[in-house]
Amino acid sequence: MRTGVIMKKSHKDKIVVVGAGNVGEAIAYTLMVRVQANDIVLVDVNEDRAKGAALDIAHGTSFFKQVWVRQGGYEECADAQMIIITAGIARKPGQTRLDLAKTNVSIVKSITENIMKYAKNPLILVVSNPADITTMAVQQVSGLPAERVIGSGTSLDTARFRYILSEKL
């Protein structure tokens, strides 16, 4: 299914976002607004969620030239300039960080196996939590060198901390 508007077809970049939840949708929207790629593909185990998110974002593409937002599958990773993994479950009340890590590591390992079926030497950005552990899992499963697997690290925690401090000061 193709969604979005292309005003002029020229291949700049394709970015695949795996995980069409709140974080994945926000990242795809930001990529569209900043025109970081002219082909943004959302991949999710829940294809309807990915289609809906792609449509929501694509409705704004008429304000930005050369941006195409759509839902797709892992085969889209074959020629992507970057793959961003945002998939994973959110931490539930009472759930330990270790339990979250076990679940999300399992999820990103499966995602990485699917990515590597199609992509030869991808650049992967891991945003799933806990970021350091999931990034290491992606690197181990993919066999990619460290410079091809980038984790968001504690950037989100730092941003949250800065926000809380600004509210208190």
Language-model segments: which ranges?
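N-terminal Rossmann-fold NAD(P) dinucleotide-binding loop
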Residues: 24-25
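A short, basic/flexible loop-to-alpha-helix module at the beginning of a structural domain
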Residues: 2-13
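Aromatic pocket-lining residues of Rossmann-like dinucleotide-binding sites
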Residues: 31
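Rossmann-fold dinucleotide-binding core
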Residues: 87, 126-169
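Conserved N-terminal Rossmann-fold NAD(P) cofactor-binding segment
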Residues: 43-81, 95
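Glycine-rich Rossmann-fold phosphate-binding loop(s) that bind the pyrophosphate
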Residues: 20-21
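Rossmann-fold NAD(P)-binding glycine/threonine-rich loop
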Residues: 94-145
